[in-house]
Amino acid sequence: MQMPSMHRYGHPGQNQRRENQSIRNYLSTRSGSRNRISRSPHNMASVYTRAPAIAYDDDTYDTLEESEDNGFVKTIPNEEQFDNSRGRDRTRSGRSNGHSFLGYLRDTFTERQPSGRRGSDTSRDMINASLKSRARSRRRSSSRRRHRNASMHMHFRGGSRRSATGSQNLINHDRHRRISQSSLGSSREGEYNHASRSSRVRRRHRRSSRRRGPRAGGHGDSFTSITPSGSAEHPISDIDQKRLRKNSDTSSRGTRESPIDDSFGEDNYRLVSRNRATSIYTTPSALYTRTESLKTYKRTTGDSKGTSPALASFLEHKTLSADVINHIPLLRMLESVPRSEAIREDELLYMSAKTFKYVSHWYSNSRPDYANGKMYTSPPPENALAWKRTAKQAHALILHLGRDSLRSSVMSLRELNQSNAVLFLLNSCLKIAICIHKNKMHKYGNVKILSTMPHVRKGDAQIFENSTIHTMRDPMASAARASYGSLAYWPELRCALGSENKRIVRYAIVAMLQAEIYLLTRISSQRVSMNKSELRILSSCITMECVAACIAVQFLYTSLWQILYSSKINREYIWLKTASERSKKLPMASTDLLYAEGACLGRLESSLYGTEGTPLGRTLVEAYLATRSAFTELIYEFQSNSDLFLEKQNVKLGEKLTAAVITATVVLQRLLGHLNIIIAQMVIGSVYHKKDVDVWSETFKMYQYLSYVCKSLYRPVTIDEYINDRDDTMEYLTLEFARGDPPTGMASVIYEDEKSEELESLKLVPPPINYDILGNLVPLRNAIEDASDVIFEKRAVETARREPQRAN
């Protein structure tokens, strides 16, 4: 009579157990000790049923099947089998003849022979295989030692059927334990044999199925439940679980395997077995359900007065950032990015930098191509952009100042990946929206441009009013805020945004990088090599970029509100709706930015065009145009898909909306870092070197407003901090500022590339007569006082404020 492998080795899903050994290999050869094995229904030696459909000498695990036809379910014994009087009589007769229970088992299973594939060496092979089998899990030594004696007792009721040799077995228990451990291997060392297994069975009555944990019995695993009738309920096995995981791993990225195809696939989102978004950095919330997330996007109706949209139950009270993020479709951006795709994306970013020849990439540890030593910041010849030697040095300096500091943090933190960066950006968006909605910026005076922007009514955005969303404080967040807005240089992060969005990010950051490089070739601690027209263009670009950043912040506020709320009666929706209709005609769909361009650049047309134009001025303006074009594209993309998302509630469209918001946040952070650098350069050139320049009076009010609202996204750097960072980087790169022009052998120059199409097609519209959004032109020394707390150190500000009092 053969017995099924399920009872001998447990459930077939336990993949660490062997299925093909004979039961005799698990029994001690010292039968004279007359030790018995537990006859519980859960022990393998107690089942007398037919053989399974598999060969005992077949060591292939994949041949197991879990259908009801293979004997695993039908051969499970019930209580009647163990109450069979004939079996009891046979057992008594075996004992009365002086044979032990182990000898009885040998007689019972004598006729069972495995297939003859291995010939006479079958038993020896089985013994070797049994000694190699490992336990699936181990107990603590104390727990194993505490319940080892349980296997030495019979589990019949009242002990009336205990044999005469039972007491002797208990006396010789210690000796038998040493023998069994030496002959069959100690269970403490991980060897899985019958002695170690049966020693874990707890003392129990005949019909009791209680065990000391899920691994103590044979088939009483945590994955299988035994019914009172003796039948088993089998859920999905480990084999099928492995297959599911394998299939999900191979298809999780779907279309992302190709570095060219980055389209958002709806099929990828159907992999519901993946962890939720916030499980990467926080404990999953019990509030989240798939049905509740869909309620958030349902369309609501109301009267023209403006009613609060219907919210899911979890949004009606104070919530955490994890609960909010779970209801924003972004799983597509949290998937891993292949290294080959990221390397290709990094190469595309620096293809436009042909002027600098070799450029160090994100995954490269080598320095860029530049000359050590003196760095000359004198003005180049007429119509030239910069000295080539100085431009290469400035390129290495700017990249090490921002990008390389972030890269070193990413490489040093193993748990840091682009998924953490996406969650950081989304958390920053939520903090920005809450800060705008709650404070309304009255604390920072009357910023005129804010008066033209709509505000969500109180009660229409409870998520912004009642949420307790905290700013992320982990090492990754600190590194992202303190690297001059360099998250845009991270190739994996750009790939996670999608094919169209990463192209937009590349276009913006390349233009800003070139402007920073060529500006650094003209300003140093020793001299400023910029004429008056170039300083005026720099001042105008700072003003226009502050206006663009304020509009971008407002876009994040309104877009997040529209993703979380589907009401169309609010003023915010009207603003976004009209923005989509005019975004192709207006920069960032804003008349304020249109008039700001006319006011700032209208008086500088002669410095931009014609023979008197300056290449450096055009480079600075091109950086601004590229940034505002990127924002304009993202605003149009968001609004063109938002109507369809509200109507169809399509997950694919929802992920596109979220990707547009995250991309705008990436560009905004890079713009804030760019503003920080060029403002520091202008202050060094104007205040420290006494170069007078006029600035619009509202410029630094907007900059202070941005510094406060976006403090969760970017940490502004003061002038003193910037100078210290720059000097430390130059010392690391073995560079030093020098006066005069480069020597004759190093005096090659860089000329401007082909003129920008955007700059050539730029049409300036003069503002109306009563237009007062930008204020008046004032000297830089006076305008900078509005943001002195952000630009200068606190000690310097306090000292400057005490000086007028001492003079009086």
From Swiss-Prot:
Compositional bias of kind Polar residues: 162-171
GO cellular component, one term: viral tegument
GO biological process terms held by the UniProt record: regulation of DNA-templated transcription
Basic residues: compositionally biased ranges: 133-160, 197-214
Region of interest called Disordered, as start-end residue ranges on this chain: 1-21, 77-266
InterPro entries, sorted: Herpes_UL47
A matching Pfam family: Herpes_UL47
S-S bridge residues: none
Superkingdom: Viruses
Subcellular location: Virion tegument; Host nucleus; Host cytoplasm
Transcription regulation as UniProt keyword: yes
Coarse class of the protein's main subcellular location: virion
Keywords: Glycoprotein, Host cytoplasm, Host nucleus, Late protein, Transcription, Transcription regulation, Virion, Virion tegument
Bias type Basic and acidic residues, positions: 83-92, 235-259
Its biological purpose: Tegument protein that can bind to various RNA transcripts. Plays a role in the attenuation of selective viral and cellular mRNA degradation by modulating the activity of host shutoff RNase UL41/VHS. Also plays a role in the primary envelopment of virions in the perinuclear space, probably by interacting with two nuclear egress proteins UL31 and UL34. Plays an important role in the splicing of glycoprotein/gC transcripts and thereby participates in bird-to-bird viral transmission.
Misc. comment: Expressed in late in the infection.
Quaternary structure note: Interacts with US3 kinase. Interacts with UL31 and UL34; these interactions seem important for efficient virion nuclear egress. Interacts with UL41/VHS.
Family: Belongs to the alphaherpesvirinae HHV-1 UL47 family.
Name of the protein: Tegument protein UL47 homolog
Lineage: Viruses, Duplodnaviria, Heunggongvirae, Peploviricota, Herviviricetes
UniProt gene name: MDV060
